Amino acid sequence: MTQQANQTVATISAEALRQSARNIAAAAPKEGDAWRVDDVAALFALPFNDLLFRAQQVHREHFDANTVQLSTLLSIKTGGCEEDCGYCPQSAHHDAGVKAEKLMDLEAVLDAAKAAKANGATRFCMGAAWREPKERHLEPVIDMVREVKAMGLETCVTLGMLKAEQAQRLKDAGLDYYNHNLDTSPEFYGKIITTRTYQDRLDTIGHVREAGINVCCGGIVGMGEAREARAGLIAQLANMDPYPESVPINNLVQVEGTPLAGTEALDPFEFVRTIAVARITMPRAMVRLSAGREAMDEALQALCFMAGANSIFYGEKLLTTGNPQADRDRALLARLDIRAEGYAG
């Protein structure tokens, strides 16, 4: 009798918690109001089906739910970075087998952009492993932006921290997006990186916004953080004024030789929840299913699309880590009857 009573109490308590989560989520702030971390955590706590249903509703209000954008990311300068980001094999602080390379020349970048466009990408991102770009590096990157944009591709670069005048020069060159991720919540951040402050990141995003460039800003999950840190990251992003136009959500790719190698993997459904919460809190953003996709099976990727992801990075590599082959992506999208934006291929 006592055991049955305990089971009943446990059942009632669990149901009460679920109902509480529903009530809090229903009372979440209207768009434009601030998201408290508790509000975001309440979304994470919803039953999985309820969360995905709500995310899909929000997604359909702002996007065609059966269309995704294909993006390609090219490392234009690999390795030798001064930062000590615990997840990154390009850091000079870690022995991950990535050799420092010079900045690619313009023609090689343009060849890669042409190939990306031919394969259906409408967005071309260029990443350089710098703490911040030096003057001698910025002008070649500006040339890359101009030439890639002239091909009709949406352009994005990620070069590290930017000064206000550097952001303005990139804007003048026609840059569409600048990527600078927050990585995680302010509270967990110090466990991942020590060479750049959270405020440094926010300052760069501010310079990008002031220059009139679209902001691409997201984070990485699966770095050993608690759900509260994931909620804190989403709250930080959603409370930007305005929130980012582009929100990449990365699942940690563990690389031998980096401090985060061996971290316990994130529950796959928790990753889907993160996508869904990003969609609900930032309804008009492009939510990009980014690093870590190579380790995801097709069913998990399909759930991410259901949760509101509407962009994938397309091509064999994301900077230095693996990514699904393009033909696998095309086959998956075809099976799901999902169209690639602007591509009839």
From Swiss-Prot:
It holds the Pfam family BATS. [4Fe-4S] cluster binds at residues 81, 85, 88. Its EC number is 2.8.1.6. GO terms for biological process: biotin biosynthetic process. It catalyses: (4R,5S)-dethiobiotin + (sulfur carrier)-SH + 2 reduced [2Fe-2S]-[ferredoxin] + 2 S-adenosyl-L-methionine = (sulfur carrier)-H + biotin + 2 5'-deoxyadenosine + 2 L-methionine + 2 oxidized [2Fe-2S]-[ferredoxin]. Binds 1 [4Fe-4S] cluster. The cluster is coordinated with 3 cysteines and an exchangeable S-adenosyl-L-methionine. The keyword tRNA-binding does not apply. Its cofactor is [4Fe-4S] cluster; [2Fe-2S] cluster. SMART domains: BATS, Elp3. GO terms for molecular function: 2 iron, 2 sulfur cluster binding; 4 iron, 4 sulfur cluster binding; biotin synthase activity; iron ion binding. InterPro entries: Aldolase_TIM, BATS_dom, Biotin_synth/BioAB, Biotin_synthase, Elp3/MiaA/NifB-like_rSAM, rSAM. Residues 66-293 form the Radical SAM core domain. Pathway: Cofactor biosynthesis; biotin biosynthesis; biotin from 7,8-diaminononanoate: step 2/2. [2Fe-2S] cluster binds at residues 125, 156, 216, 288. It comes from the Bacteria. Keywords: 2Fe-2S, 4Fe-4S, Biotin biosynthesis, Iron, Iron-sulfur, Metal-binding, S-adenosyl-L-methionine, Transferase. It is an enzyme of class 2 (transferase). Belongs to the radical SAM superfamily. Biotin synthase family. Homodimer. Catalyzes the conversion of dethiobiotin (DTB) to biotin by the insertion of a sulfur atom into dethiobiotin via a radical-based mechanism. This is Biotin synthase. It comes from Cupriavidus metallidurans (strain ATCC 43123 / DSM 2839 / NBRC 102507 / CH34). The lineage of its organism: Bacteria, Pseudomonadati, Pseudomonadota, Betaproteobacteria, Burkholderiales.
